[in-house]
Every structure is written in structure tokens, then in C-alpha cells.
């Protein structure tokens, strides 16, 4: 094994530097693919949690699949902790390394030995190996791992923070890799049927994680057209990959699954964007799915007539009144905004950390036609500026945005835990948001009282418990500011050289 270059600066180095090191270490094609699939935003590093968490979570949720991490110990500790905090019920594999094993190539040998030790067909259908920042930047070649050991599939992927901007897109990295593997298996010959069996009707594969009841609601809406709901990607079982590829139509509920969509298109499958959210969204989505399957117009109309009035009734029975800004990193932010607007809310701004893709174009156009500012690859700074500028009755967003909103006395809800944890599709989703939204907006007066009560206790670096009144040292602040400006100018000058 030839010596591998060591990633200088570790995972604390800048994105451009790590990406350049990865390209120099033999991962130029990988970095080019990441750049095309997941275009970066205005910020240097991901503003969500470590992107690898997304791929790790997908692997840990799958039955008979082992997941192994290769990265810095601190990163693996954090990823293991947060995975189990969110309910993982199995161990995370870890291949440790030091500077010597990384540079000499011994790390790859250790990874290969670990995979061989794990490859027990009685326990596993597949083993997923994930390179984190440092091994990717150093060029640890997971593509040289065997495709199969003792009948156990081996899937190696790189999920560096300097190539994959959000943990939501890391789910796509692993989903795309597994679909690519499964597609090769299908092309090679017969494959096992899913444990749940095959539907006797044509199916529609759903792309993107969603509330557990949503696929069932979608299935009910497809039934009048003679269609059935298929597997949901990311999936929970390897055999479901075959069933997902077997569907002639794929619904890109979450539109950022670029790698997965590439595999479906390679298999000749039609992709339909948007989702059956709200009345307008559901009517258009059912029509697009029906046309993709060459369903007769009368059957499409039957499905629309069966659910359109119910959705209108649910929306009318659960109105939402107030100005709401929406932001997050799940990829469903535009769908939520649509539902809020149909429910009566004023939504001046939608920010999503996900990139712009063709599969969200209809949602974007619908929102912009109603005066909504839609921002893809929105940074925390974008979302906070929108919140401060529009002064909403309610701000929906990530944890730091919620924290800032509450400090300003603005009611706020965390998107991931309080919005994604509710049904959005069809009649079930139409009235699902009103109670929590209206209750949160009703807290404005109480938050104002709390803000007034704590006025003057300090904030930022003067917050907390002090023995005396905290001293601000403005001279020291100014001195440090000048040092930082000087360092920034020097760094820019070096780049130009």
C-alpha cells in the first residue's frame, strides 16, 4: 500500500483546503460529483449538525445492516452520541487511526479487516462503511473494498463536511449508493422479493423521510387511479431497494435526493416533483402521477373528487391566522409553507438549507406567485435577517433561530421536532398544523412579559451569574477586532499569490 497524504489541519481546516487535499489524494472525481450534486451555500461549513449523521441514521435504521465509521475519535463519539440520543438501538462500528496508520495506508487495511470480521451472513445483509472528513481528505480508498464478503454486501461512501453541506443530503449519498448497488444486482439476475410482498397494482416509490402516516394517506389517494404506494426511500430493509426500483414512477416528495434520482432515471423511471400537500398541491400532484402512469382522465378526476372536498373542509375547519416565517434543513420547508398559506397564514419568507432542484420548481413558482420570498441554501444569517425584517407572529426554524427569536420576544417553533413530526399529506395534513401554530402565536403576550421581567440581566458574553457587574473591556474588543481584520487581509493576499 502506498503512503497516503495526511490531511493537514484535520477536520478544523477550511473547506477549500480540505477539498483540495482530497482531490490531490485521488478523490478529485468524488469532489467534482459532490460539487455537482450538492452545490454549496454562502457559508464555509455546514450549519446543521455533522452531515455524516444523516447517512449514519439511515444505516442504523435498516434491518440487518451494520454501519461502520472511519474518522476522528471526537467526531465518532459525537455521531454515536447523537444517534443514540435520537433512538438508535444498535452499536456504531468504529475503525480508529492515528497519524502513522493514516499516512502509511495501514488504516485502509484496518478497515478491510474490520469488514471481514463483521461479514456474517447470518446477521447482516450489508455493511455500510462511512469515511468522515480526515480519511476522505487523506484519500482512504473505500472503493477498493470488496463488493461482497461471505454473501454480505459492502457499501463504502465518503461523507465529508467539506463536500456534503447538510445531514439531509447525506441521506441521499447513502441512498444513492445503495440503489446503485441494488440496480446492479437487478441487472445481473433475479433478486429476492420484499419481506412485505409485492403489490398487485402498479406502485409509486416515495422519495424522502416523512411522518409514518403520510405514506398510508398517499396510498389511499392513489387507490382510485388503480395505483398503490410503494417503498419509501431511505428504506428500512435491503430488499425494499428492489421494490423501489421496480416502481415505474418515483415521487420526489423531498426534492434534494439527487444521487437517488440519478439511479432511478438510469433505471428508466419517471420522476414527479412536489407532494400532495394542501388542496392545490394534492390536485396537481394526483394529475401528474396519473399522467406519468397513463391513467385515464376520468380515474384521475375520480381521485381528485374523492379527496379535494375533504381537504378543503379540513383546511376551512382549522384556520391559521398570523404572519409566519418558515426555515429549516429538512427539505420540506416549501411544502409546509404552502400548507400554511392555504390555511390562511401570511408567509412572507421561506428559507431552506437544501439546494434548488427541478423537483421543487412547482412549489417555488406557487409560493412566489403569492409574494413569498423563497431562499435556497439559506444560511442562519439569512433566516435571522428575514425574521427580524418581517417581524412575524411566529418564526419556524432551527434551534439557533428559535433561540434568537425568543430572545426578541417572538414566539418560535423548532421545525424538525414540532413540524416534521406531524402529517402533511392529503386530508390528514390539512388540519394538522393549526393547533400548534395558533397556540404558539397565542404566547406572544406571555413572551413579552418574560422579556420585560428579565430585562437588564445581561445577554451574550454578559449573561449568566456574576459576583460583580461584568466588565466589557471595549479597548480589548477593538484590539482583537483589528487583529482579526489584519489576519483576514493577510490570508486574502496569500490566496492571490
Swiss-Prot record:
InterPro entries: BchY, LIPOR_BchN/ChlN, Nase/OxRdtase_comp1, Protochlorophyllide_Rdtase. One of its GO terms (molecular function) is oxidoreductase activity, acting on iron-sulfur proteins as donors, NAD or NADP as acceptor. The chain crosses the membrane at residues 65-82, 126-142, 216-233. It is a multi-pass membrane protein. Its EC number is 1.3.7.15. One of its GO terms (biological process) is light-independent bacteriochlorophyll biosynthetic process. It catalyses: 3-deacetyl-3-vinylbacteriochlorophyllide a + 2 oxidized [2Fe-2S]-[ferredoxin] + ADP + phosphate = chlorophyllide a + 2 reduced [2Fe-2S]-[ferredoxin] + ATP + H2O + H(+); bacteriochlorophyllide a + 2 oxidized [2Fe-2S]-[ferredoxin] + ADP + phosphate = 3-acetyl-3-devinylchlorophyllide a + 2 reduced [2Fe-2S]-[ferredoxin] + ATP + H2O + H(+); 3-deacetyl-3-(1-hydroxyethyl)bacteriochlorophyllide a + 2 oxidized [2Fe-2S]-[ferredoxin] + ADP + phosphate = 3-devinyl-3-(1-hydroxyethyl)chlorophyllide a + 2 reduced [2Fe-2S]-[ferredoxin] + ATP + H2O + H(+). SUPFAM superfamilies: Helical backbone' metal receptor. GO terms for cellular component: plasma membrane. The keyword Cell membrane applies. Pathway: Porphyrin-containing compound metabolism; bacteriochlorophyll biosynthesis (light-independent). It is found in: Cell membrane. It is an enzyme of class 1 (oxidoreductase). Belongs to the BchN/ChlN family. NCBIfam families: BchY (TIGR02015). PANTHER family: LIGHT-INDEPENDENT PROTOCHLOROPHYLLIDE REDUCTASE SUBUNIT N. Converts chlorophylls (Chl) into bacteriochlorophylls (BChl) by reducing ring B of the tetrapyrrole. Chlorophyllide reductase is composed of three subunits; BchX, BchY and BchZ. Forms a heterodimer of one BchY and one BchZ subunit. This is Chlorophyllide reductase 52.5 kDa chain. The gene is bchY.
Amino acid at each position: 500500500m502506498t503512503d497516503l497524504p495526511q490531511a493537514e489541519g484535520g477536520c478544523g481546516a477550511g473547506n477549500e483546503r480540505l477539498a483540495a487535499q482530497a482531490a490531490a489524494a485521488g478523490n478529485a472525481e468524488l469532489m467534482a460529483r459532490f460539487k455537482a450534486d450538492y452545490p454549496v451555500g454562502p457559508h464555509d461549513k455546514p450549519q446543521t449538525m455533522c452531515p455524516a449523521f444523516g447517512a449514519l441514521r439511515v444505516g442504523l435504521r435498516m434491518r440487518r445492516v451494520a454501519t461502520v465509521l472511519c474518522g476522528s475519535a471526537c467526531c465518532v463519539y459525537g455521531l454515536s452520541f447523537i444517534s443514540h440520543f435520537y433512538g438508535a438501538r444498535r452499536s456504531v462500528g468504529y475503525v480508529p487511526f492515528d497519524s502513522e496508520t493514516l499516512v502509511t495506508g495501514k488504516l485502509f487495511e484496518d478497515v478491510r479487516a474490520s469488514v471481514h470480521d463483521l461479514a456474517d451472513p447470518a446477521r447482516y445483509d450489508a455493511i455500510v462503511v462511512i469515511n468522515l472528513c480526515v480519511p476522505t481528505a487523506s484519500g482512504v480508498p473505500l472503493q477498493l473494498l470488496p463488493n461482497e464478503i461471505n454473501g454480505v454486501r459492502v457499501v463504502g461512501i465518503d461523507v465529508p463536511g467539506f463536500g456534503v453541506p447538510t445531514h439531509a443530503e447525506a441521506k441521499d449519498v447513502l441512498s444513492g449508493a445503495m440503489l446503485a448497488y441494488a440496480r446492479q444486482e437487478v441487472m445481473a439476475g433475479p433478486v429476492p422479493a420484499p419481506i412485505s410482498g409485492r403489490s398487485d397494482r402498479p406502485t409509486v416509490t416515495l422519495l424522502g423521510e416523512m411522518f409514518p402516516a403520510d405514506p398510508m394517506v398517499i396510498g389511499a389517494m392513489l387507490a382510485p387511479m388503480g395505483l398503490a404506494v410503494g417503498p419509501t426511500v431511505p428504506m428500512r430493509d435491503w430488499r425494499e431497494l428492489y421494490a423501489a426500483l421496480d416502481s415505474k414512477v418515483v415521487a420526489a416528495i423531498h426534492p434534494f435526493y439527487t444521487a437517488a434520482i440519478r439511479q432511478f432515471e438510469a433505471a428508466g423511471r419517471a420522476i414527479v416533483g412536489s407532494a400532495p400537500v394542501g388542496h392545490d398541491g394534492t390536485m396537481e400532484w394526483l394529475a401528474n402521477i396519473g399522467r406519468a402512469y397513463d391513467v385515464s382522465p376520468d380515474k384521475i378526476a375520480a381521485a381528485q373528487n374523492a379527496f379535494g372536498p375533504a381537504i378543503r373542509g379540513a383546511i376551512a375547519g382549522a384556520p391559521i391566522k398570523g404572519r409566519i416565517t418558515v426555515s429549516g434543513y429538512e427539505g420540506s420547508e416549501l411544502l409546509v409553507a404552502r400548507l400554511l398559506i392555504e390555511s390562511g397564514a401570511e408567509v412572507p419568507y421561506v428559507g431552506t438549507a437544501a439546494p434548488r432542484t427541478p423537483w421543487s420548481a412547482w412549489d417555488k413558482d406557487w409560493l412566489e406567485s403569492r409574494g413569498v420570498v423563497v431562499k435556497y441554501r439559506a444560511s442562519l444569517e439569512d433566516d435571522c435577517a428575514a425574521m427580524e425584517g418581517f417581524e412575524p407572529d411566529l418564526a419556524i426554524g432551527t434551534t439557533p433561530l428559535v433561540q434568537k427569536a425568543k430572545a426578541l420576544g417572538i414566539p418560535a417553533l423548532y421545525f424538525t421536532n414540532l413540524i416534521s413530526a406531524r402529517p402533511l399529506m392529503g386530508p390528514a395534513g390539512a388540519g394538522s398544523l393549526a393547533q400548534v401554530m395558533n397556540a404558539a402565536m397565542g404566547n406572544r403576550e406571555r413572551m413579552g412579559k418574560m422579556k420585560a421581567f428579565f430585562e437588564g440581566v445581561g445577554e451574550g458574553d454578559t449573561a449568566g451569574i456574576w459576583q460583580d457587574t461584568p466588565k466589557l473591556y471595549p479597548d480589548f474588543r477593538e484590539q482583537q477586532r483589528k487583529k482579526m481584520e489584519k489576519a483576514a487581509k493577510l490570508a486574502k493576499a496569500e490566496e492571490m499569490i
